[in-house]
From Swiss-Prot:
Residues 11-88 form the RRM domain. GO terms for biological process: 3'-UTR-mediated mRNA destabilization; cell differentiation; DNA damage response; endocardial cushion development; mRNA destabilization; mRNA processing; mRNA stabilization; negative regulation of cytoplasmic translation. Residues 175-199 are annotated as: Necessary for interaction with EIF4E. InterPro entries: Nucleotide-bd_a/b_plait_sf, RBD_domain_sf, RNA-binding_reg, RRM_dom. Gene3D superfamilies: 3.30.70.330. It comes from Rattus norvegicus. GO terms for molecular function: mRNA 3'-UTR AU-rich region binding; mRNA 3'-UTR binding; mRNA CDS binding; pre-mRNA intronic binding; sequence-specific mRNA binding. Disulfide bonds: none annotated. This is RNA-binding protein 24.
Length: 236
């Protein structure tokens, strides 16, 4: 002979979010106002005997269970509980109006440029998508920031007389052992060539004996420069 078990699909209620001090008696007392109760139990830990924070209440009929689940914010023993039919599980938590999601705001400068590329950096074309505007860097500014030598151009040679400069250039040209060719012209520069000067030359007023002596010393120092050694190394 088999005993018939009552169907509790629509009468058994899951109660979650209970305080640890809630007992079977206090749980039953809360649900008595909705109708007759067949069972009210708080689930406890077997080893410690403390409440696990949830329980089950079985109402006598389906109508009483529906009334017990209507309240969206039930308060049991001073704490908001989660009440729903057991076969449905716990109710999803309802977000309060005005709940703000933690979305990080982006700076306008990062939105305007893909991947937040700053404007004062120069990136290779292979790493930049088409459409990214990269500021143009003047060649003179780039050369001034990268060259380790002192560029002795116009202003630096102003202290020498035109005659001394012409004589020095002629002396340097006479010492070059190779004939001029189109291939060799790429190695010869006449203006803006960088030299490492060890001792500064004292400027003197033009038309004086000191100016003539300074010009002669500059011509002699310039004439001792032998560019053929540098050219030989490059052509080997």
């Amino acid at each position: 002979m088999h005993t018939t078990q009552k169907d509790t699909t629509y009468t058994k209620i899951f109660v979650g979010g209970l305080p640890y001090h809630t007992t079977d008696a206090s749980l039953r007392k809360y649900f008595e106002v909705f109708g007759d109760i067949e069972e009210a139990v708080v689930i406890t830990d077997r080893q410690t005997g403390k409440s696990r924070g949830y329980g089950f209440v079985t109402m006598a009929d389906r109508a009483a269970a529906e009334r017990a689940c209507k309240d969206p914010n039930p308060i049991i023993d001073g704490r908001k509980a989660n009440v729903n039919l057991a076969y449905l599980g716990a109710k999803p938590r309802i977000m309060q109006p005005g709940f703000a999601f933690g979305v990080q705001q982006l700076h306008p400068a990062l939105i305007q440029r893909p991947f937040g590329i700053p404007a004062h950096y120069v990136y290779p074309q292979a790493f930049v998508q088409p459409g990214v505007v990269i500021p143009h860097v003047q060649p003179t500014a780039a050369a001034a920031s990268t060259t380790p030598y002192i560029d002795y151009t116009g202003a630096a040679y102003a202290q020498y007389s035109a005659a001394a400069a012409a004589a020095a250039a002629a002396a340097a040209y006479d010492q070059y052992p190779y004939a001029a060719s189109p291939a060799a012209t790429g190695y010869v520069t006449t203006g803006g060539y960088s030299y490492a000067v060890q001792q500064p030359i004292t400027a003197a007023a033009p038309g004086t004996a000191a100016a003539a002596a300074a010009a002669a010393a500059a011509a002699a120092a310039f004439g001792q420069y032998q560019p053929q050694q540098l050219q030989t190394d490059r052509m080997q």
